[in-house]
Amino acid sequence: MKTIFIIDSKTIDLKYIRNWQNNIQNTLEDYIQQKGLKYVVQTIYDIQPNPLTIIDDTPLTFKDIINQQASQSSRFAELFYNKKVSQGDHFIFMDAWNPAIFQLRYLSTVYRVPIWIHGFWQMGSFNKTSYLSFAKNLIWQKHAERALFAAINYNYYDSDYHLAMLKTNFKTIAAKKLFNAPNRIHKAGPPMEHVRDYAKQYKGTLKRNMILFADRGTVDRQLIIFRELQRALPQYEWVCIEDKMPNETQYHGLLASSKYVFISDLIDSSSITAFEAIMHGAIPLAPNRLNFTEIVPEKWRYPSEWTLSYVNYTEHYTQIIEYIKDKMENYDTYKEGIEEWALHLDTNYYRIDEMKRIIFDIQE
């Protein structure tokens, strides 16, 4: 009997991370049961999850993250010492930027128990919007990331946009050889099965003249722009989820009722909000930058310079107002093709089919 360990990435029930972990566990367990395979799936928590609203007012501090990673290293040591790890077991990290991976690989080596490590790459010094890239000298970060990449057997990226960024860390001959090694890197996840389920549940929901702000109002998401547009165009219904504090079911109900979701992010993400919107038939009004250029069709994107800063927004204020009016008045025209694009995203993004193939050695 082999064990698939899923490593908890957050100590609290945040908007996405806990869903990703649950989706992976459920997907793997369903396949194991369906095929009658001899595997068990176990999530390793350092603190049991707490139920929170979709918006968390107290996100983890860097101290919390370091403490959690130290706790994970201790848990790994206990597992190996107590002979709870067997040859061929799998360890899945939702965030590949985790120094506990080094300790896990060390334990596997000294106890002579070969294991397989999987890691999802989300952020790193290769991403210029990540806090890991803010230092003037990035030498140690790049070396650490290449070492993590080498310690992980199967590295995963969620979009071609992120793959291109990750490649920038592997420019030397030796680094390129590592990056291009067979089966070293794959496209997968993070899995969004719960979004697919909610999309089916809310299919056919009546659309309101609503524009939704579907993220926390952090500085890098520029909620101030949404607030000013709300005051300028009161004829439309503007909803910020920070004001509603919905639970997950209510959150997806708001998405299903919206015609548009407004996005003005300055930091890179996996464009999950845009994916959620499209799956619910809501059009994401996203800037022509970051990985929105891959997830959101060009006809729905607005020029990046319009919201590169608050100053930029004021300079392009009139254009943005006319843009919003046009979108609202011609929703039926702009929504054409949204079901086809939703199918494209559903088929090619936010899935773990490739991970399943690797773990269970599925032959095509």
Give the label of every model feature segment.
Residues 1-103:
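N-terminal pre-catalytic "stem/leader" segment of glycosyltransferase-like enzymes
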Residues 265-267:
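Aromatic "clamp/platform" in nucleotide-sugar-dependent glycosyltransferases that forms part
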Residues 283-286, 293:
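Short hydrophobic beta-strand element within catalytic cores of glycosyltransferases
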Residues 134-155, 256:
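Membrane-proximal helix-turn-helix segments that form the acceptor-binding/catalytic region
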Residues 150-199:
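Donor nucleotide-sugar binding/catalytic pocket of nucleotide-sugar-dependent glycosyltransferases
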Residues 70-71, 307-364:
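A charged, aromatic-enriched C-terminal amphipathic alpha-helix characteristic of glycosyltransferases
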Residues 17, 193-248:
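Conserved catalytic-core segment of nucleotide-activated headgroup transferases in glycan assembly
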Residues 90-95, 108-131:
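Active-site proximal beta-strand in glycosyltransferases
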